Structure formats: structure tokens, C-alpha cells
């Protein structure tokens, strides 16, 4: 089973992204950067996809919380931004809901709690809540901004042959691939077994936020780090895009 079999075409997405790049000259990698004098402002926008649907289908499982989706959103936004060496400054959110429910306040609490754990404690400064009665489920997206001195900006252009690739252990699936994950797991007998709730809780584990770890590493080893990649949608292909056409990965 692959993405195509569940209605997600990565090839179509790549073609569409190429067309977008022609219309957005600042588009670059997992976030975009703007020169503001001595610094770069780095911005990113993301969502948490169909992990929301998995939550809604299993919200009654003990230990499952909508607050965790708030951490997922912060992770998706700022894990991208920190790849450029940027320290988080602030975040906005967009929440679309079928109707008003106090449950969504817990979702915002999850965002705020996650932001408080980041270096610099960036605030959630504003947002938009749209009531769309015709939609079946809620959706949320986040927009974040960070900053870094030009001298510390990392864009992968200095990656060269012989560089070593180091990986950080993830917390699980982050917030990507859940359309495929749901299809695979829901067809497995395991989700109808006594272990079902534990599997659901693991699938809904909030995404690890790597910001503080990456910034600490950069303070100590910045001159030796030529590129950073957030492995989410697309997996290892993200590394290939970062390295460019003339370099390849080797075990």
C-alpha cells in the first residue's frame, strides 16, 4: 500500500509545488526567508493534516487529548523554521470549525503550552476563528516567524561531498502520512484487539519539537553545520532536495 492507493499523489504535489515556485520567488525549502537588514526573518506555515481525523475518531480513548494537537501544530511550524538557524519570534493560527465548542479552547491551550517551552517563549499573538457549518470537522493551521543573523543563516548551499549526516530520534510519525497510516492500521486486526487503545495513543503522540535542541547545537557547532532538514512529508526526499542534484546519500 502506498500514497497513491489512498488518493494522495506525491508526484502531483511535486508538479504543483514546481508551479508555485514560479509564482513565489521567495519560496525556498521548508520555510521562506526575507532580508530585513542585519537579519533574516524566516517564516513558515503548516497544518497537522488528517491526524485531526484520527483524533476525532478516537477522542474517547483514555489519554487522548486535543491539547496534544496544539503541540503538533507548533512542532510542524517551528521545526521547519529552525532548520534555517532561526530563533522563534511569534506565531498566528487559523482555526476553521463547524460550530463553536469549548473543546477548541483546549486546543489553543496546547499551542500556548508548547510555545512556552520554546527558547524565547514566542507568543501566539493573533489568529482567526472561522465558523463553517457546512464542514464536518475542524481544521487548524499555524504561521510562525523566526529570526537569525545573516552570518548564522543555514540554507544548505554549503553542503559538500564528505559531509556527515546525523539524525535525531523522532517521537513517532509527527503529523505527516496519517491518511496512509489510518488506512493501513484501520485494516489491521490489531485495531480491534485489546491493544487498540495503546496503538491509538501512540499514533496520537504529540510531535517532538526539536527547536531547543537544534539551537543549542548551533551555538556550539554552527560553523560545522551546513544544512538542517525536518523529515516530515516526503521523508528522505527532503534531504535530497536540500543537497541538490550533484550529491547523493550514502550509508
Can you describe what each PLM-predicted range is?
Residues 1-82, 117-127, 160, 165-167:
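N-terminal glycine-rich phosphate/pyrophosphate-binding loops that anchor nucleotide-derived ligands
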Residues 1-7, 62, 95, 102-121, ...:
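Glycine-/charge-enriched secondary-structure boundary and capping motifs
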Residues 79-87, 242-243:
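Alpha-helix C-terminal capping segments
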Residues 35, 48, 60, 73, ...:
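Glycine-rich anion-binding loops of enzyme active sites
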Residues 178-189:
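Short, compositionally biased
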Residues 14, 179, 237:
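Alpha-helical elements of the RecA-like P-loop NTPase motor core of helicases
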Residues 56, 179, 240-241:
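Short amphipathic alpha-helical segments
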Amino acid at each position: 500500500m502506498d500514497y497513491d492507493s489512498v488518493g494522495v499523489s506525491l508526484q502531483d504535489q511535486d508538479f504543483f509545488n514546481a508551479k508555485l515556485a514560479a509564482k513565489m520567488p521567495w519560496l525556498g525549502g521548508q520555510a521562506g526567508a526575507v532580508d530585513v537588514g542585519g537579519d533574516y526573518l524566516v517564516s513558515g506555515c503548516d497544518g497537522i493534516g488528517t491526524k485531526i481525523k484520527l483524533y476525532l475518531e478516537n477522542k474517547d480513548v483514555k489519554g487522548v487529548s486535543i491539547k496534544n494537537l496544539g503541540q503538533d501544530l507548533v512542532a510542524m511550524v517551528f521545526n521547519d523554521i529552525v532548520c534555517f538557524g532561526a530563533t522563534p519570534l511569534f506565531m498566528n493560527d487559523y482555526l476553521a470549525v463547524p460550530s463553536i465548542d469549548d473543546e477548541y479552547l483546549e486546543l489553543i491551550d496546547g499551542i500556548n503550552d508548547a510555545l512556552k517551552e520554546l527558547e524565547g517563549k514566542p507568543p501566539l499573538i493573533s489568529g482567526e476563528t472561522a465558523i463553517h457549518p457546512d464542514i464536518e470537522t475542524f481544521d487548524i493551521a499555524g504561521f510562525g516567524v523566526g529570526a537569525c543573523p545573516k552570518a548564522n543563516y543555514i540554507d544548505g548551499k554549503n553542503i559538500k561531498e564528505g559531509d556527515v549526516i546525523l539524525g535525531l530520534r523522532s517521537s513517532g510519525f509527527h503529523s505527516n502520512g496519517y491518511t496512509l497510516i489510518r488506512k493501513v492500521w484501520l485494516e489491521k486486526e490489531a485495531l480491534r484487539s485489546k491493544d487498540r487503545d495503546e496503538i491509538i495513543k501512540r499514533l496520537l503522540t504529540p510531535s517532538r519539537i526539536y527547536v531547543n535542541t537544534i539551537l543549542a547545537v548551533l551555538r556550539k557547532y554552527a560553523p560545522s553545520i551546513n544544512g538542517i532538514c525536518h523529515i516530515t512529508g516526503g521523508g528522505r526526499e527532503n534531504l535530497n532536495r536540500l543537497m541538490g542534484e550533484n550529491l547523493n546519500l550514502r550509508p
